[in-house]
């Protein structure tokens, strides 16, 4: 697993956007050979999305032949609800780029048969040959998507009950009212994410420091689902300095030394 440490959230966002854009450019997607991209919601990727929008508007990258799969969606709120992940993605990314609507895939939290919705999502991902690059963020407790502590590290797309910690953390998007936060969601599983050819995780802020420590320095543990990345052959965590405060000095120095030549990844 690689760890790229950048000074600020802005630097992290730029690095992540450049990495995604470079992967798409290198693949040279076409209509018959699309690039399959997994995407997150939440506060962590917003800066990356802003940078990708600028790269798209400047003509450096196109999303016309990119097919996206989002990680998760709340159960029981309408797609046009301002805090649904459908709304989030259109507001912060999709409406600003040249992606085709038919190439966007987001779980339907209002499907009549939620279990079937999850099964069909898995089948659709597999029908495209799997996800080439899955971008994600993590919660303070180390969860990826809505794979809360205790989730199976081989789990697939499914219905998940949210922990009180996650509900409290997400209440900032619901006027600070925990009672307005949905109590369950549909989410891709850890196994779904781990099947991706490459995983890129964005980590920023002091409140993610303990999760990053468990991801990098501790053992694999289903109570810290981010730790599953240790088993992936091509996983990258890009972190700001604030999130590294619980790492050992030697760990930080080690990764800074071996990744120094990769700090500047501006598009060529």
UniProtKB/Swiss-Prot annotation:
Disulfide bond listed as a keyword: no
- Protein family membership: Belongs to the glucosamine/galactosamine-6-phosphate isomerase family. NagB subfamily.
Which residues are the active-site ones? 72, 141, 143, 148
**Pathway(s):** Amino-sugar metabolism; N-acetylneuraminate degradation; D-fructose 6-phosphate from N-acetylneuraminate: step 5/5
What is the role of the protein in this entry? Answer: Catalyzes the reversible isomerization-deamination of glucosamine 6-phosphate (GlcN6P) to form fructose 6-phosphate (Fru6P) and ammonium ion.
One term of GO molecular function? glucosamine-6-phosphate deaminase activity
Record-linked PANTHER family: GLUCOSAMINE-6-PHOSPHATE ISOMERASE
Which reaction does this chain catalyze? Answer: alpha-D-glucosamine 6-phosphate + H2O = beta-D-fructose 6-phosphate + NH4(+)
User: Sorted alphabetically, which InterPro entries does this protein's record hold?
Assistant: Glc/Gal-6P_isomerase (IPR006148), Glucosamine6P_isomerase (IPR004547), Glucosamine6P_isomerase_CS (IPR018321), NagB/RpiA_transferase-like (IPR037171)
Record comment: activity regulation? Allosterically activated by N-acetylglucosamine 6-phosphate (GlcNAc6P).
Q: What are the UniProt keywords, alphabetically?
A: Allosteric enzyme, Carbohydrate metabolism, Hydrolase
Site residues by UniProt (Part of the allosteric site): 151, 158, 160-161, 254
Enumerate the NCBIfam families for this protein: nagB (TIGR00502)
TM region(s), chain numbering: none
What is this enzyme's EC?
Answer: 3.5.99.6
Listed GO CC annotations: cytoplasm
Biological process per Gene Ontology, one example term: N-acetylglucosamine catabolic process
Cite the Pfam families for this sequence.
Answer: Glucosamine_iso
What protein name does the entry list? Answer: Glucosamine-6-phosphate deaminase
